[in-house]
Amino acid sequence: ADPTAEDWGTGFQQLGTGGAAMYIAANDAVAQPTQTNGLDVKKLALGAMPAGPNGDQYSLTGGTPYMFSKDATPEQISAAFDFLEVMGKAPEANDTTIKGMEADAANRKQNGVPVIQTFPCWTNKEYVDANNKVVEEYSNVDTAMFQQFFDAVNKEGNLHTEEPGDAQEMYAQLTNVLQAVITNKDADIQKLMDTANSNYQKTLDSEFKKN
């Protein structure tokens, strides 16, 4: 596979079909290489981003937005929140939420998707214990193959939100650096980073600098 020609979807296709060995993603995307692209569930693992030269190690955090129509009634909004419990996604450990967790885990197991821990959004003990119990009951993978990722993202200070400013442009500049490094063993990393920094600074100046 040519890493310079891949995007979110085709990258997972390459990973799932044997055209690539590594992909940068998170635990919410494990269905892409497996269920969507046919990778054996036992051939997938997750690891944390490597630490930098000073030992600093970070992971990007984000989330999936749930939106309501501006015309939604209070009853409709309340029902939508209730549906989060039905899906097992709410920060509760009641019967409805646990049944949702179990249904999701059963569906994953049936369709060859890793049944693993969730991203540490909710930290109340009742929820975490209930979720861990469901994962243990429906597990279809060797958890050691995923533990290093979860150990990292659960460390205090590991999770960082996107940088303020035009983060997508920053990603584009860093993608140029990554692609150059993995396709040219003699790439001048410092020069590439300096160029990326200069280009990104120009973007910030043009978009945010006040006259």
Write out the residue ranges for each language-model feature:
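Extracytoplasmic ligand-binding clamshell segments of periplasmic binding protein
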Residues: 1-36, 47-49, 192
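Extracytoplasmic/secreted envelope proteins and their assembly/folding machinery
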Residues: 12, 16, 27-30, 77-84, ...
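Conserved N-terminal structural module of periplasmic/extracytoplasmic solute-binding proteins
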Residues: 75, 91, 95, 163-166, ...
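Sec-exported extracytoplasmic/periplasmic mature domains
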Residues: 16, 20, 28, 35, ...
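C-terminal lobe and pocket-closing loops
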Residues: 33-39, 55-60, 67-172
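Small-molecule pocket liners
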Residues: 44, 63-66
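Short, well-ordered loop/turn elements at secondary-structure boundaries
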Residues: 16-19, 41, 62
